[in-house]
Amino acid sequence: MNKEYEYSFYVEEIEPFIQYCEKNNYRKIRECNQTRELYKNGNKILARVTKNYIDGNEKIFLDLKDENETEDTLKICRESGEIEVTNSMEFVNSLLEMMKFKFHKKLERKRYVYEKGNVKFEIDDYKVPKAKVVAIEGDKLEVDKVYSEIKNRNF
């Protein structure tokens, strides 16, 4: 189990953040369309079933995360690793039902992921619901430094 340290915030446009990553030698590790279904079980835990669509292929992943619906920019929460379940959806649905997870909502987005050292940018252009979100996560000291730099640039 990992403890995630993340700044997450809404933005007007994602392009300046993509340009920031590219100009500062962040490596693009993924660009894909995603759908994510969120499930809650009343214990402040979310189950997330994420479908990544890359080059016409679909891969499905399951992970768990502490529920954190605050408006705070900084979020610190526990997060499991993810497991690929592309060929195991019958099992996943059975597991969610047995653990009393109920469907909460579905998200659709295009996600860009950039990484450099211990810092990862997840830049999301949501189609449903309509929104643009940037998340910066990783090592506390490095993430704090990058977030401070971004904040001072007034993107």
Where are each of the predicted segments found?
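Acidic, contiguous internal or C-terminal segments within carbohydrate-active enzymes
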Residues: 125-135
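Mixed-charge, glycine-accented linear interaction segment located at domain edges/termini
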Residues: 139-155
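N-terminal strand-loop-strand beta-hairpin
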Residues: 1-119, 153
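Short amphipathic alpha-helical surface patches that serve as generic macromolecular interface elements
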Residues: 89, 133, 144-147
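Short loop/beta submotifs within extracellular cysteine-rich repeat domains
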Residues: 28-29, 131, 141-144
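Acidic and generally charged, gly/proline-rich low-complexity regions
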Residues: 104, 135-138
